[in-house]
């Protein structure tokens, strides 16, 4: 069969499985690919369980994560699905954003109900901004008593409500193992789950539809033409002759106009999210702009020095610190393209943070950085990554 080309016609949605270890996340991922392959063979290839379980290593912000990516299609949508086998891999993925999720399937074994990691994953999903969660009650073939299933469902709904997720989210009874074995009744339930995913996870807002932002990677002067700032457009679209602001690092913002856009030495009328471009900016000297600033649509992004974040601290084995850190820890915070020193305040009741822990922290930076809630950062000491995190709240 010819390899199907990537169709742009369908909405593309990133999802993942979350939940307690051994509740069947990876089995469910394999079952979804098999059932969709059997139902729509022209749209899907099947992925074997052992391929998904041997999750390849990836690096995100200097942290190694084991994570599997599979893709599949329903009639309505194209999905990229991430599954991380180990609990630590989940936490690292959610905090570093190696694989962003537009929505998640929370897998809860009907035999156990919500467990500590179930709660932790839902809490993290809230903190890192996963927009929507629905539920697969797995191993439902092993519970004969409907009352037990109803109790588990109630517990899961309470857990979602406690973290401000939709407590009326779909809860679908499944047996991933039975569906993998081809049992028709349980196969039908997987299709029901995917119909719920199609319906309940909202279409994501694509990066091109957001306001323009480009981190500055380099600045140089072209004789006779002026100053060019280069970088990869993070979001939005920029057109020639549009006004922009350059913000961050310095006390004041700089207003200017983009008079030219270049990509691969060709002149363009516009650039969009994902493009590596050079922007020719009017009336700006080379020394007015530096790496670490961002070029933005006027009024859309502001620089800040104080924020709260959720961070994962590398273990010694991962190349992180060998010792814990305490209040007033002063590492560098690497945002987009540059390091800025910051002072860490730990939450009340937390005396120290050990390598391998994840923690909340308040940070005060010595220079302002253009940021929004949800921005990712690395924590570094002398250029070596010792942690990664995400801004959960801006304080100043």
Swiss-Prot record:
Pfam families assigned: GTP_EFTU, GTP_EFTU_D2, GTP_EFTU_D3
PROSITE patterns xrefs: G_TR_1, G_TR_2
Chain intervals for the UniProt region annotation (G1): 19-26
UniProt-annotated binding residues for GTP: 19-26, 83-87, 138-141
Organism the protein comes from: Rhodococcus opacus (strain B4)
Region: G5, residue numbers: 175-177
UniProt protein name: Elongation factor Tu
EC number: 3.6.5.3
Residues that hold Mg(2+) according to the record: 26
Subunit organization: Monomer.
Subcellular location, record wording: Cytoplasm
PANTHER family xrefs: ELONGATION FACTOR TU, MITOCHONDRIAL, ELONGATION FACTOR TU-RELATED
Reaction it catalyzes: GTP + H2O = GDP + phosphate + H(+)
Superkingdom, natural source: Bacteria
Function: GTP hydrolase that promotes the GTP-dependent binding of aminoacyl-tRNA to the A-site of ribosomes during protein biosynthesis.
InterPro entries, alphabetized: EF-Tu_GTP-bd (IPR041709), EF-Tu_GTPase (IPR050055), EFTu-like_2 (IPR004161), EFTU_2 (IPR033720), G_TR_CS (IPR031157), P-loop_NTPase (IPR027417), Small_GTP-bd (IPR005225), T_Tr_GTP-bd_dom (IPR000795)
């Amino acid at each position: 069969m010819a390899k199907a080309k990537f169709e742009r016609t369908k909405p593309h949605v990133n999802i993942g499985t979350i939940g307690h270890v051994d509740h069947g996340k990876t089995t469910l991922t394999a079952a979804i690919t098999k059932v969709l392959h059997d139902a729509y063979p022209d749209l899907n290839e099947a992925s074997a369980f052992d391929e998904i379980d041997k999750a390849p290593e990836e690096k995100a912000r200097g942290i190694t994560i084991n994570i599997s990516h599979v893709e599949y299609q329903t009639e309505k949508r194209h999905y990229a699905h991430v599954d991380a086998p180990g609990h630590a891999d989940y936490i690292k993925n959610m905090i570093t954003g190696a694989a962003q999720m537009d929505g998640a399937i929370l897998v809860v074994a009907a035999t156990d109900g919500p467990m500590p990691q179930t709660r932790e994953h839902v809490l993290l999903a809230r903190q890192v901004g996963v927009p929507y969660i629905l539920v697969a009650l797995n191993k439902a073939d092993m519970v004969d008593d409907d009352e037990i299933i109803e109790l588990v469902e109630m517990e899961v709904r309470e857990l979602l409500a406690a973290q401000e997720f939709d407590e009326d989210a779909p809860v679908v009874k499944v047996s991933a193992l039975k569906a993998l074995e081809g049992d028709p009744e349980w196969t039908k339930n997987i299709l029901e789950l995917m119909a719920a995913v199609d319906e309940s996870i909202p279409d994501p807002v694509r990066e091109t539809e957001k306001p323009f932002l480009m981190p500055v990677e380099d600045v140089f002067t072209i004789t006779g033409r002026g100053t060019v700032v280069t970088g990869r457009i993070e979001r939005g679209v920029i057109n020639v002759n549009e006004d922009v602001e350059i913000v961050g690092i310095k006390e004041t913002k700089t207003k200017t106009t983009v008079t030219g856009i270049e990509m691969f030495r060709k002149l363009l009328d516009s650039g969009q999210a994902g493009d590596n471009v050079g922007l020719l900016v009017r009336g700006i000297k080379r020394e007015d702009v530096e790496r670490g600033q961002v070029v933005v649509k006027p009024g859309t992004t502001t620089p800040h020095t104080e924020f709260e974040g959720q961070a994962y601290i590398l273990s010694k084995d991962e190349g992180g610190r060998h010792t814990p850190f305490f209040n007033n820890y002063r590492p560098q915070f690497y945002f987009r393209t540059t390091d800025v020193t910051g002072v860490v305040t730990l939450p009340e009741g937390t005396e120290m943070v050990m390598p391998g822990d994840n923690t909340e922290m308040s940070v005060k930076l010595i220079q302002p950085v253009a940021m929004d809630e949800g921005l990712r950062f690395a924590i570094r000491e002398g250029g070596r990554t010792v942690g990664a995190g995400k801004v959960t709240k801006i304080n100043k």
